[in-house]
Amino acid sequence: MVVQPYLSIVGWARNDGYTPNYAKRLEHALGFLVRQLDKHKVPSEVIVVEWNPPPDRPLMAELLGSLGGAGHVSVRVIVVPPHHHEGPQGWRKRGMHVNNAANVGIRRARGRFVTPKALDTFYSEQLVSRLGRLDLEEGYVYRCDRLDARMEDESWLDLPDDELLESLARRIFHRNERLTHSIDWKMRDLHTNACGDFLLMSARRWLDIRGYQKDPTVLCLDSDSIALHAAAAHGASEVHWRDECIYKIIHGNTHAQRTATIWKNWQIRLDHYLIGRNRRELAMALRVWLDYPRRRVRGLEEIVAPSIERNFVAKAARYARNDTSLVTNDADWGLARDSLSERTVLRAAWDAP
């Protein structure tokens, strides 16, 4: 009989060469995470959602070597066939839909608490130690900062765990700290900066908000921030852990480096005119109503994404009024009605087959 784990960590993967040595990076990061969770005795599962696997490459479950394990952690790999990827704008060009992949894992998570996690990031020792206290509360959503590190080569893949964390800490070039939002946005003051890397709340709260929003494109812009504001509207108070953090090794595909706003001349003139006459509220309202400035992501320029004001700010403002009638996904979100192939590559002692 399976006992409910305390924590589910949900990641997504696709063996498509998105980053160099992807499979090796993933195996290293998974093993690292398993060892951390075991060290701090966290009854947990790591769910890897393999989304739209390329037919000419091996599945990730076949590439993963021994992850070790001391009995506290299960690792499950759930495979989502390619036909589920078809449809959203840009699907032929980008093989991953992060929202949909994450939702598959979140919907199938067994843990009392659930967080998404990019599988190539690393939790600090302080963060896993904090999780190991097993004192999370269902009325909260937990956040921490992501620290970006730049490594010169791939030699870090061979470092022991403690040395890797020390090396990452020495090579930080950017901290994704809490941002101060414009008062014109009329939203809660929440820590949305890079929040998709650690957005920890109860499984019940994830069900309340129906996971990440449904996105008609493969870009999935603003979805983590929207989820955080939705959770707050549904009653979760934010806790920002200051001493705990996540490390990310930055490569050329990092999202923030690829997104640009698109202004038309009339929009710039109108915006400057209104702001210059202290009509900031009207300027913001027009950005929402007329949907500008819109956005493009490098490599997917054919998709003109909605403005942050239309896609995020307007929703966050409604959530600030506790308007939970705003629902951003279907009742069967996360492919809840579909039976998907699953393989357990590491089984915890609590997880009896």
Question: Which residue stretches match the model-derived regions?
Answer:
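N-proximal low-complexity "stem/linker" segments adjacent to membrane-targeting elements
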Residues: 1-38
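Cell-envelope/extracellular polymer assembly enzymes that use nucleotide-activated donors
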Residues: 6-10, 45, 226
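Short beta-strand/loop segment that forms part of the nucleotide-sugar
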Residues: 42-55, 76-83
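Active-site-proximal specificity loops/subdomain of glycosyltransferases
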Residues: 58-108
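Conserved catalytic core of nucleotide-sugar-dependent glycosyltransferases
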Residues: 93, 106, 124-215
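Short beta-strand-to-loop acidic/aromatic patch adjacent to the donor-nucleotide binding site
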Residues: 111-124
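C-terminal catalytic/acceptor-binding lobe
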Residues: 187-188, 193-195, 215-353
